[in-house]
Amino acid sequence: MSVSAYFHHRFQQFRSLFKWIVLVVPMAVVVGSLCALFLWSLDKATAARFDHPWLIFLMPVAGFLMVLVYQHFGRGSEGGNNLIVDQIHEPGGGVPLRMAPFILVSTVLTHLVGGSAGREGTAVQLGGSVASAFARVSRLGHGEIRILLMAGIAAGFGAVFGTPIAGAVFALEVLTIGRMQYEALIPSLAAAIAADWTCHAWGIEHIHYHIGYLTGIPASTFHLDALLLAKVGLAGVIFGLAARCFSELSHAASAAFKRFCAYAPLRPVIASAVLIGLVYLLGTRQYLGLGVWSPNPDDATILGFFDPARVDYWSWLWKAVFTIVTLSAGFKGGEVTPLFFIGAALGNALAAIFGAPADLFAALGFVAVFAGATNTPLACMIMGIELFGATHTVYLAVACFLAYICSGHTSIYLSQRLGIAKSASDNIPADTPIRHIREHRVKKRRGNANKAEEV
């Protein structure tokens, strides 16, 4: 390559980089501001629910109206995260801008009346809808739209959790299992950092988690404990199986609601009756809402699972039940924060069984169950480092990667595609959506059941 050609090539790279910075930073500022508004509203809604316990009885009405409004005015927005992933894989009509206000209001309403849901799905949809609007105004081509949508995902994720590096990697990793979308690396990183900074500039503070195990020991002098590593490996397998069960049961519950209740607005009414019944059956409301904090110190919360003095064996299971019923019926929000709760609770229980540090295992479960349910082990490992520190990197990596392998070809995102199979023995064509893999698996299972009945 001649000198002139070399400098011309570098100039084109710099020009492309400058263009993307100019495009994604304003978009990320908008997304970060919306995420700040969302987190502030969510905090107020959660506080209001604790202050006014009777709000739970409005759950059936809220759910009915929410789905009814989506049916009449939110057409094209109902696909949620799966719609955004589909648009990145195969750009079509784009992500409607109305998705942003619809998902923000409906998620806050879900939490106000006690639905067990999260916030990641809302943040990603805020990012995707704003990014799509910027793409339409900028008249971008299909390839550029894909990159901007990925940057929108990174912005939403990075801002809502305060983990910009994990947000950038999540946007590259979540689309296709086993394959990273490196063409969007710089735009996604810039968007995640800008959105996170904007969210902080609005005064939003994120929860800080503390792991007492090995506190004060620099990461550079850390040496592995072989027995503890073996326990972490076993826990990683269990986290992956838990993630697989959560994903499969979520999709099965959603299909069951659609099969047995054709009128969509009635589904959340039925779910509300189930949830309120469970509250009175169990005698507690601790599995409602986000589950990050509670004014009642005896309630199970994500923060509480990091306390070595607390042992809770079944909170992870009940939180999974409450979340699956809530989201599969049509209430809005994300699955990720409930997955954090489920993982931290399961980690706390496994620590008691294995004789391991409770705070460390709560942290491992926090990220590993998420890794298994979304097939994003690298992003989750990085998130663990951003939230809990680099001292525990090896344990975080082992837990996340084993959970990813053991969760199989399942995902909470049915639009996610298979790039590289997790096992060489899996004869699944590349770029097959998880939705098709699951449908094939269900048909095969039904066929085997019919054959067994005939015999």
Swiss-Prot record:
Record note on disruption phenotype: Deletion of the gene causes serious deficiencies in nodule development, nodulation competitiveness and nitrogen fixation on Phaseolus vulgaris plants. Deletion mutant is unable to form stable symbiosomes.
Single GO molecular function: chloride transmembrane transporter activity
Keywords: Cell inner membrane, Cell membrane, Membrane, Transmembrane, Transmembrane helix
Membrane topology: Multi-pass membrane protein
Location, primary (coarse class): membrane
Summary of the function given for this chain in its UniProt record: Essential for the establishment of a fully developed nitrogen-fixing root nodule symbiosis.
Family: Belongs to the chloride channel (TC 2.A.49) family.
Descriptive protein name: Symbiosis-assisting ClC homolog
Naturally occurring in which organism (per UniProt): Rhizobium tropici
